[in-house]
From Swiss-Prot:
Protein name listed in UniProt: ABC transporter ATP-binding protein RamB
Organism whose genome encodes this protein: Streptomyces coelicolor (strain ATCC BAA-471 / A3(2) / M145)
Deleted gene: phenotype: Deletion of the ramC-ramS-ramA-ramB operon on rich medium leads to an initially bald (no aerial hyphae) phenotype; after 4 days develops a substantial aerial mycelium. Wild-type mycelium on minimal medium. No expression of SapB, normal expression of chaplins. A complete chaplin-negative plus ram-negative strain (deletion of ramR or the ramC-ramS-ramA-ramB operon) leads to the complete loss of robust aerial hyphae.
Record keyword Transmembrane present: yes
Main location: membrane
Keywords: ATP-binding, Cell membrane, Membrane, Nucleotide-binding, Transmembrane, Transmembrane helix, Transport
Gene transcribed to yield this protein: ramB
Protein's job: Probably involved in exporting SapB from the cell. Expression of the ram locus (ramA, ramB and ramR) induces rapid aerial mycelium formation in S.lividans.
Top-level lineage group: Bacteria
């Protein structure tokens, strides 16, 4: 048995015992009706044997027909027995369903209640409408089949013993061998089934993700990697399916041994049995016990245990098992240096959107070397646009390591731009503290803030002046080589040549939105500020240009925070922050696909 199944059995055994202990009366009545079914199985075979030995072979057809009439009455009485069994079965299965529904509702309510984990329990609907019914049906099927096999087998074996003990010597060994072989296959079969399901789910999820992300895979050139990963998943699924098929073959062999070998053994041993005093009627009665009672019950038992049993175990563990713990956010790895982007000489102050000014010597002195401080740190930051308004950000804690590339994603209007404005210092939090390079940004003069960060908004600002002045707006001393390298890194050379070179005059109205964004991105790239904040600053670029720009910015000394416009930005980042209005989650692209339903939804929307 796998550790998963063993753990599930340990968790479920105590509540199962308590549930059955409170329903002893129903179980006793169910056993009494099942005992009647056992008597029915006994009578049918015994009556057939007597009808032959004491009736037809003895020359008394009336007596033979009378015994056959007894067998017929026993068969017809089965309808009343089945009705009684199902009436008592409801007394066990319906309370189980009611208890599971109550537990699922209580669990969902506790999650949403104050002090609970919080968040929407998206699995609650599945548990209430699907998993509870699966558990009810599977439990009912197992009770019926186990009860039927135990009591029918008891009646049939007792009938064989009453006809002649030698019959048990022939029938019991293959029956026990097949049943033992079947029981041996239960554990590895369940483990193989779990592996096959997991492999199939992983393959389906990858196929759906890849199909939805075709545009981004093509733009980022990651198609071959996705193809290799898909091929590995196909191979894993095929291997799991082969293993499952192998155990299924063993189970089929077990069913054949237990279900057909006793009949064959009885046929082969007819002469031996006749020599030991077994009558013809006893042989026919034995065949009746095997074919009409014992073997059908055994076949039903094996089928139910193989399918409904494992399904019931999994579903009950999901409903009654412990709530999965949320995965902890990965701690940012400390970097040895904050970065050399803070230069000691005076620099241009701020980006156009926060008002142009010039960084003074005091601002440069403020930008000291702080190796231990995070590049960005938010401590229980809350922001709301009014006393009675719902907070846009509520008690947000965030640490971004120096040199880290962080992408921020979430639905429109969730607070992504608000977050960048808070970090940039252009917006003050209602509560909490925002630090950049270890310094509180709220209330700092523009010159000091300009030495720490550059914020590039969605609507890029280009002013009337030369191309070089626009690119070097945040630096006073870029060398021609630095300008040329930056222009080349961002693919801006065709635009510069079209305009007439770095000394040519720019007319902003003649530039497209994407061209203006490229100019603003190069400007931010040349800035000495150690922190770059991009608020959907690449939304007007095509995917290839966006990837090229983000690669250049990520390769720059310092920290990069990007409010993502496309999925590819999150894929390229070291870490992604997901804002959903309730909680914030962070992790790599692969980690968030596994634990954040919202991130999976956004991934589908971005790529559709």
């Amino acid at each position: 048995m796998t550790s998963t199944e063993a753990g599930a059995l340990r968790r479920l055994a105590p509540p199962a015992r308590r549930f059955l202990a409170h329903r002893k009366g129903v179980l006793v009545r169910l056993a009494l009706w099942s005992l009647a079914e056992s008597g029915q199985a006994f009578l049918v075979g015994h009556a057939v044997a007597r009808s032959v030995d004491e009736g037809f072979l003895a020359g008394d057809p009336r007596r033979g027909l009378l015994w056959l009439g007894v067998a017929l009455v026993a068969v017809l009485s089965g309808a009343r027995v089945v009705r009684g069994v199902f009436a008592q079965l409801a007394g066990v299965t319906e309370p189980l369903r009611d208890g599971l529904v109550r537990h699922a509702v209580d669990r969902s309510m506790a999650r949403a209640a104050p002090g609970g984990p919080g968040g929407t329990d998206r699995a609650a609907v599945s548990r209430l409408t699907n998993q509870v019914e699966i558990a009810r049906d599977s439990f009912a099927g197992l009770v019926l089949t186990l009860r039927s096999f135990v009591f029918t087998a008891a009646g049939a074996l007792l009938g064989l013993l009453s006809l002649h003990p030698a019959l048990l010597v022939v029938v019991l060994p293959p029956l026990a061998a097949g049943l033992a072989l079947f029981l041996v296959t239960l554990r590895p079969m369940a483990a193989a089934q779990r592996r096959a399901l997991a492999a199939d789910e992983a393959l389906g999820e990858h196929a759906a993700s890849a199909r939805a992300a075709l545009r981004d895979l093509t733009a980022c050139g990651t198609g071959p990697g996705a193809e290799r990963h898909g091929a590995d998943l196909v191979a894993d699924a095929a291997a799991a399916a082969r293993t499952l098929a192998g155990w299924a073959a063993v189970r089929t062999a077990a069913l054949g041994v237990a279900g057909h070998l006793p009949v064959l053994a009885l046929l082969v041993a007819v002469e031996w049995l006749r020599g030991h005093g077994v009558s013809v009627g006893a042989l026919l009665g034995a065949f009746t016990y095997l074919v009409q009672s014992l073997l059908p019950a055994l076949h039903t038992l094996m089928t139910a245990l193989g399918a409904a049993g494992s399904r019931l175990l999994v579903v009950l563990d999901r409903i009654l098992g412990p709530e999965p713990e949320p995965e902890p956010e990965p701690e940012p790895e400390p970097e040895p240096e904050l970065g050399s982007g803070l230069e000691p000489e005076p620099e241009p102050a701020s980006e156009p959107e926060s008002g142009p000014s010039t960084a003074s010597a005091s601002a440069a002195a403020f930008a000291v070397h702080t190796a231990a401080a995070p590049a960005v740190e938010l401590r229980s930051v809350t922001l709301s646009y009014g006393v009675r308004a719902e907070p846009v950000l509520d008690a947000l804690d965030l640490r971004v390591a120096p040199g880290e590339h962080l992408a921020v994603v979430g639905p429109s209007g969730i607070g992504k731009s608000t977050l960048t404005r808070l970090v940039a210092g252009t917006l003050a939090p209602s509560r909490g503290e925002v630090r950049v390079a270890g310094r509180v940004v709220t209330g700092r003069p523009a010159a000091e803030l300009a030495a720490l960060r550059v914020l590039v908004p969605q609507d890029a600002y280009v002013f009337s002046g030369t191309v070089g002045d626009n690119l070097a707006y945040l630096r006073t001393d870029p060398s021609p080589a630095e300008l040329d390298a930056a222009v080349e890194a961002f693919g801006l050379a065709p635009l510069v040549e079209r305009l007439g070179g770095l000394d040519a005059t720019v007319r902003p109205a003649e530039l497209s939105p994407g061209e203006r964004q490229l100019v603003a991105l190069v400007r931010a790239y040349l800035s000495p500020a150690p922190l770059l904040l991009l608020d959907e600053a690449t939304c007007h670029l095509d995917p290839a240009s966006e990837a090229r720009a983000e690669k250049a910015l990520a390769g720059r000394s310092g920290t990069l925070v990007v409010v993502a416009h496309r999925l590819s930005s999150a894929v390229r980042a070291d870490r992604t922050l997901v804002l959903d209005g309730i909680r914030a989650q962070s992790g790599t692209h692969a980690e968030l696909l596994g634990r954040s339903p919202l991130y999976r939804d956004l991934t589908g929307h971005w790529n559709s």
